[in-house]
Amino acid sequence: MTKEVYVIDTETSTTHWTEGIPNGHIVEIGVAKVNLEKFTVLPAWKFIVSDPSASPSAWIFENTDLTYDEVMEGTNPLIVSKFLEDKLKGKEVTAYNIAFDSMMLDRDMPYLNNCVRWGQDLMIQSSKVPGIPRKHAGKDTWPRAEDSYNYLCPKDPCNLHGKEKHRALDDAEMEGHILLELFFRGLYTLKE
């Protein structure tokens, strides 16, 4: 059995949160395949997902190169969900902050969320590594993905130059390298 884990990342059209729930929907989803025997991270799939309710002033459009028009012309979420269900059913999947990605998937693509086997959360596992910065805006927090990547991957295999792109596939690949480093340190264990 090949030791593979799929890393999923979502980007959303969120403009604000109400009682811990974001108002947006998934507008981009990226999946990277991590092979723990070959120590590789490869792009698997990426989709721009249609969200007719998206606001042109959403954070994602103002802080990345993803455009409002791309999302308006994106793939129907049901088509994306069905494709990824077929590819990922029964596979081990993880994310950096599973609680967020799982919440978004549960709302927008529930069948996909329920057909995968969630592995260990990369954010929680990264918090066990001494030295990764845990302060953001002056507050103690969970380590941010880019801080974990910069600390664990000083050779910068994704050529990010210290800055997370906030594009789903790019971030999934970055998080895949975090997974490899956690695995090397014995901080990520495959589900059997």
Residue ranges and their predicted role:
Residues Q120-D140:
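Short alpha-helix plus adjacent loop in nuclease-associated cores
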Residues M1-T2, E192:
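Short, Lys/Arg-enriched, disordered terminal segments
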Residues E92-A99, M103-D108, K135-E192:
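Acidic, Mg2+-coordinating catalytic module of metal-dependent nucleases/exonucleases
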Residues T2-P110, V116, E146-C153:
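Conserved non-catalytic scaffold segment of RNase H-like nuclease domains
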Residues C115-W118, Y188-T189:
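Short, structured loop/turn "capping" segments at alpha-beta junctions
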Residues T15-W17, S127, H177:
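Conserved protein kinase catalytic core
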